[in-house]
Amino acid sequence: MFLKRWFIRALHRLQKGPGYGYSELFVWYCNNTNTHGPKRLIIEGPKKKTLWSLFTVTFACLVFWQWGLLIQTYLSWGVSVSLSVGFRGMDFPAVTVCNVNPFKYSKVKPLLKELDELVDILLEQFYSYSTNGTLPVVFPDMRSSYLTGDPPPWYQIPLVMIDETDADNPTVTNVLGTDALSPTNNSTTNSSTEARRYKVAFHLCNTNGTDCFYKNFSSSLEAVKEWYTLQYIDIISKLPLSQKVEMGYSGKDFILTCLFGGEACNYDNFTQFYHSSYGNCYVFNWGLDGNVLIVSNPGVGFGLQLALDVNQEEYIPFLTTRAGARFLLHTQNTFPFVETMGTYALVGTVTSVGILVDEVQRMGQPYGTCTTDGLDVPIDNLYSQYNLSYTMQSCLWSCFQIQMVNSCGCAYYLYPLPEGATYCNNQNNSDWAYCYYLLQDSKDHKNECLQTCIQTCNELQFRISTSMADWPSESSEDWIFHVLSYERDDSTNITMKRDGVLKLNLYFKEFNYRVITESVATNVVWLLSNLGGQFGFWMGGSVLCIIEFGEVFIDCIWIAVIRFVKWYKNRKERQVQAQYADPPPTVSELVEGYTNQGFQPDIINSCSPQAQPPDLYLPTTLEIPGTPPPKYDSLRVHPIDTEHHSDSEDL
């Protein structure tokens, strides 16, 4: 009941309003506020009032300006980065090692025989053109291979030479086309006296040939290698996985010796997987079974020591132009992107790799964009088929592969295959190279992937420092190679060469790690503190002053509402009065209007014999009766009976 009465009184106060105008409200506020300055506006003289008005308005504007900047800074959701150093036993990273040569040439040579012969012809073409400006006639056995019947697969990616000796009239020659079978029209005389300027390019077109472009290369070496790689991909993509694994390097042939923390290990301690670029690769301490090796001391003796045999004699000549191994340090249960993030190890040397660990902790929404498991990223992670964790790199390559399938109708060989898609080849996808290079150079597609893929919230980053020395030394070369040869194939003779082996040492350089942590830079406490600081500095105010101002603001609103209601009522009353232009009737006119003659008594001689009863059905000219006037005795006024009162007094 008490609560009900309180609400009723509050409602009456709200309906009644402040009870004064704006000027009275302003005077009341200046007299009662705790803010410095407003009181001077009503107690000082005219000049000081003007001066203090200027001060108050200026400082109030400064306060609001500073408040706007502070709120804008708070809503930017900024973060601060802190760096701390810790000491503990650390998980040894996963180590992936690959031979830069994917397959043994002795096993893959039958598949590449025709392609290798064609590359020999290409090199002869380039040499002849650069010296005398002519293209030699192709060998007769190769002539029939692409002039009769259907064109060979490599014809889908034409290799052309652009002669820029005459800058105003450059000539384009298809090296493998019909115009390549005879010398060009360029004279040999000019070429002998003037060096020929030409460049090699791909002439790529869509399926119907309506859109074409040239992909230029800085040298014929890069052009031939790139062209050979595309043809190699076309051949290898058709082979089953088991055959590709069988053509690669086995763990027994590749890994000669292994030590971890002073304990012996071998290729059985590595996990083998097939890499599209490097063939069979081997991962140490991948952690797929949940077991991760921990190191408690820094130094070479507590790390991983490997001796690898890359066997250069089995290198594919036109595909692999570098010799050595490629290794990558990464976290457990993540895919090793060796081709983009790996490091080379040189043959005939020992490469020592010191490892430093950085632990990065990022903040999520609204302070940043990161993901814990990648499930909130709107891209299918194609590397999840390996049961591996999400990484930024896996998202980028998955995004590119999905765009490749959507744009070109087939998948690129170096990345995992999406469900329902097939790898590109020259027979079924004649314009796949044209589509691939357009997609690769498209900034829109790159930006789309960069904007869609986000980093993980918690990540380990490995920083490495490398140093190298010759291995083995000349004095120890003989006995080391004897021992390694015997351990590998029980041979008493030396079957290894310096240009085919290398040693790799990986260890923690320092037994500490850095933690890079993002934290909130502007929280609510920071915002309120700075808002109050600015208000107090410029106007000497506090939170209570803001409440006072809010009270005055509400009163101003109610004054405006009440005035509007009064104005609206007065307007309605004026509209009602305007409908009656004549003066209002008097009381006598109203009474006369309510008098009906039909109810007045008629003077009829009922005793007269001639009197007849009225015919109720005859039409009458009398008006329709209205409402009769009141004739109640209680409403009649009688004169005062003075005599009666006097008599009663006498009694």
Curated annotation (Swiss-Prot):
TM helices/strands, residue ranges: 51-71, 542-562
Segments on the Extracellular side according to the record's topology features: 72-541
Main location: membrane
Entry keyword Cell cycle: no
Gene3D superfamilies for this protein: Acid-sensing ion channels like domains, YojJ-like
Disulfide bonds: 98-281, 205-212, 258-265, 370-457, 395-453, 399-449, 408-435, 410-424
Pfam families (alphabetical): ASC
Keyword hit for Ion transport: yes
GO cellular component, one term: apical plasma membrane
Places the protein is found: Apical cell membrane; Cytoplasmic vesicle membrane
Annotated catalysed reactions: Na(+)(in) = Na(+)(out)
Membrane topology reported for the UniProt record: Multi-pass membrane protein
Cytoplasmic side: 1-50, 563-651
Compositional bias (Basic and acidic residues): 633-651
Subunit-structure text: Component of the heterotrimeric epithelial sodium channel (ENaC) composed of an alpha/SCNN1A, a beta/SCNN1B and a gamma/SCNN1G subunit.
Family indicated by similarity: Belongs to the amiloride-sensitive sodium channel (TC 1.A.6) family. SCNN1B subfamily.
Function statement: This is one of the three pore-forming subunits of the heterotrimeric epithelial sodium channel (ENaC), a critical regulator of sodium balance and fluid homeostasis. ENaC operates in epithelial tissues, where it mediates the electrodiffusion of sodium ions from extracellular fluid through the apical membrane of cells, with water following osmotically.
Official protein name in the record: Epithelial sodium channel subunit beta
Gene field: scnn1b
